[in-house]
């Protein structure tokens, strides 16, 4: 069984490095559990800290502009901010935004400090970053332990024994230089207390084929029905169809009235229902990346249902419940949520020259793998993945290059490449399109009759430039490292069979913060274009797009933009 707050290595033991520098540190991508929010309106703020409702920052601006409200904390260099006064074991996470050159640290109860950013993994100034810390207090038999320090989804420290301290101090944050903003501060005291138990046996039924729709079950072939004392994927032992659906139903008795957090972990597909209401909808994913929800419950019994569909991922199913000051308590059997096999991470570095790897890539929320993906690692530490079928720039990241364990370990059946650094997901569609209607929706995919990949060429440094045909025109696409990100240059030649549009960015939110500079997806990354250009910012179906018309003159045109992250 996997404990989401244990110090066990979720991604294997010591990494095996393949590439160019065998002694370089390699960091593992880490998933995080959502924590109860800290009431920042109840904190006592020193004079150099203030509450705010919004923050405005530029990558070159040394100070932060704030708006009225109480959802953020903004601090300048000076006195420490106390978050928790008498901590024991705890989990803490926060989003942090920094001005250029800013630095800040968190002081643990033992007096040791940990940084809130990392030179190799930190995002550009003015972008939101994530910090996740797990800590175990000292006991009579052992010193305190920093279970985990994760910055931007990458584990930097794990299972670190700390020097013994004569005192148990508060948790504080100190700004050393510049200014920072904090939001979504989550905190959980990890007390070992049982807060719920099954009121009786659970009923479960198994059906052939996978689905997440309960109303589909009566139409599927029934395979098995029985009871169990706790949720257990192993109840399906002996079922012959590889793909099937399990429905668990039971009554959960909770000890207190309060806000309970449920954490659902699974490999495959799953849904959680509490008192008849669907509270978690989880589609295809691997074990480890939990989905969480907070629910207000009265003391006593509540109906709980878990629908689980086995797909191609390694199967497993676990459900945890907790109050704001307790460790997550498992509502499943030990064998239902297996620990991953202790496999060393096989990492590829790109320290001496660019490295190109063809592989499959599976994006979060997608069922199908991207089977024609090219990932490029650069000595500058700026890496990216392109879907050659769609000529879509899928993801960009900083830090170490590629985790190829699922490609090269044993049979390598998944054939999946995963980023080893701080990853940023982009809109996974082509950036160029021929659209006869300027108001037409951007296509989710493009057929081979419109877009055809032609190949790639390497420059003297070993960086690729891809070539493809698009609606009668020929396009070369060159992505190169820049000081703070990647520059993408697309040259078009020939004659397109309609107006050509470049979609520079797409996401839930696009904000112009300076002339030619846009923050995307709640300051997840920036895009920069020539300030003289006049793009169109469109909103449709709750999403925004930044579109740029491309005019071919004398059979040629160039589009260039920069991604800063």
What is each model feature region?
Residues 12-24:
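Bacterial N-terminal signal peptides
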Residues 186-261, 265-349:
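Extracellular/secretory pathway-exposed regions associated with glycan biology
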Residues 156-166, 234-235, 272-294, 512-549:
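Solvent-exposed beta-strand/loop surfaces of large extracellular or lumenal domains
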Residues 470-471, 482, 487, 495-507, ...:
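Beta-strand-rich recognition/accessory modules
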Residues 1-10:
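N-terminal secretory signal peptides that target proteins for export/translocation
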Residues 29-253, 329-334:
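Carbohydrate-interacting regions of secretory-pathway proteins
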Residues 104-109, 316-325, 492-512:
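Acidic (Asp/Glu-rich), glycine- and aromatic
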Residues 30-41, 84, 333-476, 485, ...:
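Beta-strand-rich N-terminal accessory domains
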